[in-house]
Amino acid sequence: MLTEHRPDGLLAAISLDFPDGHHLGRHFHPQAQFLYAARGLMRLATHHGAWVIPPTRAVWIPPRVEHEIFMSGEVHMRTLFIEQPETPTPLSDCCVLAVTPLLREMILRAIHLESQPRLDDFRQRLQGLILSEIANLERMPLYLPMPRDRRLQAICQALLKQPELGLTLDDWGLRVGASSRTLARLFAQELQMSFHEWRQQLRLTEALPRLLAGDSVQVVARDLGYGSTRAFSSMFRRLLGETPRDYLGRLEQLARIRGRED
């Protein structure tokens, strides 16, 4: 367990730093968990799929969801453990979220409160504000669901090993013994996305840690099967709202402004 949960049932916050390559094995918490990547990149895996959490983003984990976490680069993790609110939350499953500056400051405030005398009334109000802000955050397309159907499993496992493969559904159909129409239907039914969307999200989740590690946009685009840097940048912008260069430039600017994360 990462921390002892508060016996009074209020929000608990913790600040943890991890080296590159660190792995937190499978575990779960009775509370909902909000993991904020102040620095570095995290990969979250459950039985249902995988999520990538780049710097300045966060992931929501509902109570009692078994998961493991892999660190890429030096990771500064800021964690909130939150009792399920009495009112239903729209976040019923794991999801990656874009963190606002307001929420970031509230997270840091919650961590600071852990070392202060008991301020339960204030802590309770802060928890309500944090939950309200989390519920309205933008979801990021950084989730890679995994299928149950053996034919889809064969396709997805092959692409996980070689994300640059450009085979069509017709090509895959010949390999796994199903028509492209059947495979398209299965992707929509099991994964709630098309084959093309799944492959795009796979490539995005593969691209982010490499870009953050310093690989050039050109090399990453080539290695992931894109015919041009422009095509890769177009996909990146469509999914994340900015080009790879703008994304990396923004992170560098934030790092300069903040100096180091608290």
Give a label for each model feature.
Residues 56, 183, 187, 231-232, ...:
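Short hydrophobic/aromatic patch on the recognition helix
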